[in-house]
């Protein structure tokens, strides 16, 4: 569903409203469905898996980036997660207050803040991520397994192309 209308209804209505415009309807369909799919999966995982651990999507992304790259500079977490440093600061304060991460100033450059998981944070991610992955598997359950590698490659290509446009 796309709001109260089905995807088919929405796409037909868009075609009817915008049919006279000289636009690339296939590009619009790909990007709008990519956006819808990403939001649907994110909302599902937030309501189910992440809610059980009292985590927002942003808090999960912070924990994920730290889990994979620790120790990691706070600016790298913001870049990897795609959110502002101000947003990151509030989320990290909450995660630190819950005993899931620690922040320390770099001994080489006092302006840099290094972030690591605590033992409690690592334990949470080790428990949470298999549950999260079950949700990921449910989200793609209706796709042909033999197409998943190609699909992932296509999504990577979209990401790389969009990211390369930032520099232009």
Predicted regions located by residue number:
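Short, locally clustered residues in the helix-turn-helix/winged-helix DNA-binding domain
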Residues: 35, 39, 64-68, 129
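Alpha-helical residues within the helix-turn-helix
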Residues: 51, 79, 96-97
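Key DNA-contact positions within bacterial/archaeal DNA-binding proteins
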Residues: 58, 86
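Short alpha-helical "packing" element that flanks the helix-turn-helix/winged-helix DNA-binding module
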Residues: 59-63
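Charged, amphipathic alpha-helical coiled-coil/dimerization segments
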Residues: 93-153
